[in-house]
């Protein structure tokens, strides 16, 4: 089986992850690189205003992981605008009650274990000023900035290496240069 590389785009909501993932997918396909960009399951929940489902990060992550499993070993790269480890940042974000209170250390260890079994290229997107859109989201700009900090902290505390890339007109080229070096 082919060892697929996972391109993880990390940042809070509204930083441009989905737009960048789409552009990256387009540019890689133009270069005849075998890649996939699975649909961001949490975005589907946001558009459907599925507040109950988004609180259950085990459900969210299972559906998000299906997108990886579907094309893993078939393509060279999978581009994720909702990396698996984001579940660690979101598990307590919507509620500290049921079902979030079920997900303790064992959930975190499982997510880290799954993440570490993949060949990852981790990118933290540094959002531009005034980039946030509330449409199709559960979070406002302030919460999104807090999530940026929480995500970065999760990566650092768990010794997960990542490359910071500023979101601007050169972002996709910068990611391509990193991925294809």
Short names for language-model regions:
Residues 9:
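Hydrophobic anchor at the beta1->P-loop junction of P-loop NTPases
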Residues 14:
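Walker A (P-loop) phosphate-binding loop of P-loop NTPases
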Residues 50-100:
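Conserved nucleotide-sensing/catalytic segment adjacent to the nucleotide-binding pocket
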Residues 22-66:
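Conserved substrate/cofactor phosphate-moiety recognition/catalytic segment
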Residues 1-6:
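Phosphate-binding P-loop
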Residues 95-171:
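A glycine- and Lys/Arg-enriched "phosphate-lid" helix/loop adjacent to the NTP-binding pocket
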Residues 17:
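Conserved lysine of the Walker
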Residues 40-42, 82-84, 124-128:
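Short loop/turn segments at strand-loop or loop-helix junctions that form parts
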């Amino acid at each position: 089986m082919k060892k697929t590389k996972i391109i993880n785009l990390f940042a809070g909501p509204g930083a441009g992850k989905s737009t960048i993932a789409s552009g990256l997918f387009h540019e890689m396909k133009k270069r005849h690189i075998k890649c996939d960009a699975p649909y961001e399951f949490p975005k589907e929940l946001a558009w459907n205003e599925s507040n109950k489902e988004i609180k259950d990060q085990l459900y969210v992550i299972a559906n998000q992981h299906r997108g990886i499993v579907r094309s893993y070993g078939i393509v060279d790269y999978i581009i994720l605008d909702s990396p698996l480890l984001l579940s660690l940042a979101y598990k307590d974000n919507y509620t500290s009650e049921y079902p979030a209170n079920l997900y303790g250390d064992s959930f975190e260890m499982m997510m880290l274990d799954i993440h570490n079994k993949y060949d990852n290229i981790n990118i933290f997107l540094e959002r531009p000023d005034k980039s946030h859109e509330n449409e199709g989201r559960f979070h406002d700009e302030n919460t999104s900035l807090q999530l940026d900090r929480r995500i970065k902290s999760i990566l650092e505390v768990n010794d997960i290496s990542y490359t910071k890339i500023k979101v601007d007109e050169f972002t996709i080229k910068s990611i391509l240069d990193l991925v294809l070096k």
